[in-house]
């Protein structure tokens, strides 16, 4: 008789054990010769060495399945322990699975292009309107790379200038000041990583979320780095960000040209970067549009209404300019 401790890593034990420990009870029933005690993320096993080896091998398979799909069903447990390959999930173009087990997939042609560009290039620019899924897809790609151990960390950043607010005038300490700007990034991560695991990742700096200014002076290795709302970077800021790229690192830059909040006297760093970097090998540019919007159907209509208004306003300015020149 031997005793062994098996530590579950990179998964939520609550999902692995099942509701009311149903999964663990099933595993115990399938291994009647072993004494199995599970607490937290540790499984303690006592029994025959040969039986123990088979148990450990199958727990590893179940753990891998749980990490990939964020779920563990009873039929999967039975299939794996009985030596059958579990029936394949309908993965198709699945990037990752949400914490509820729902597949996160590209929901439009241009989102799929973003996924394909990320696979082939080390730097991708994704430009599109609000709700087109560019940031959510980018974060899903980063989470997949982390789960597959292709990288060691995820770094998410945004320039904190939306709505023209100055951080110094906002209440609270630095974390209180910057968190509202970064909340959309937290929201996406919470969809894809169990709360306890996400907290652990952030405490260990495996996942880092910070304003763009905090990137200065760093070299970012073994990471997927995402710069969101890049239209609000200055030319100096985006150059600083892009040159942080280290070994085994991929970058995704997202932005919406219709939501530039910089003072009118400043040029958007994203606009300039698209012009300067066009044609550089290893950099891909993906444009999303209103057809890619996956939010409420009203969002598409709102985007169209603003596009029409801005087009008419531009035409009116040109007309007035021409009239002035003729006088």
What does each model-identified segment do?
Residues 11-31:
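Short amphipathic alpha-helix segments
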Residues 29, 36-91:
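Interdomain "pre-motor" coupling segment immediately N-terminal to P-loop NTPase/helicase cores
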Residues 1-14:
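N-terminal presequence-like segments and adjacent domain-start helices
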Residues 23, 55-58, 238:
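Hydrophobic side chains in well-ordered alpha-helices
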Residues 11, 21, 49-50, 232, ...:
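Short, surface-exposed acidic/glycine-rich loop or hinge patches that mediate macromolecular interfaces
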Residues 76-107, 119:
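Proteins enriched for Cys/Gly/acidic motifs involved in redox and nucleic-acid/cofactor modification
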Residues 42, 97-109, 116-227, 231-327:
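Conserved helicase motor core of SF1/SF2 NTP-dependent helicases
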Residues 33-36, 285-286:
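A short linear hydrophobic-aromatic micro-motif
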